[in-house]
């Protein structure tokens, strides 16, 4: 039933059925339950070539076609796909993957730091502030999305087993990369946000509506900790390969 509001983004219809469903094309595509859906640039395609992954399908958008791979990892099939940046395209692609069989998803990608955290450090978001648009089409308006405890446990188990230090954080998910004003950054820091990225709350909302497991492993890139001197650093490039390796292991633990 639709909840009407003067502000359109705050309107919500809790009916999970839509005029266009993610599997409306009726493709002959049956994906594994486990999936790594990662914001890792060319690392996904590079790894797929390295291990001889099967390209079993494609997600076609107006600007880019995304290969969907299946690999064998420790004796079980895992779906592997590069996630597009931004809440709306990432939510659409993940919803499509779910429509074709994915049920347990781990994502990873970079985040900007609002606190003094070194580059290439691994973080586990446990709550996301919803300053993006896509989540409001999947879950009724609220200030935060809480991450699923089962996913958090699986992520942290793998990190601890490998002796990798991490922190649990609250993240600020925003659509406005160029609208992270000094006053807004300070406000988010006061609220407890340690990092900022562009998809977490949206993907958590997709998972909640569709009844699937989803979690995310973040790693640090640029820094907004000093409001007078933004530092892009090296965009967390040293952690890409390690992040993918960790996500494959996390997926196997689901």
Question: Which positions does each model-derived feature cover?
Answer:
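Accessory terminal and edge-of-domain segments that mediate assembly/interaction
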Residues: 1-106, 112-254
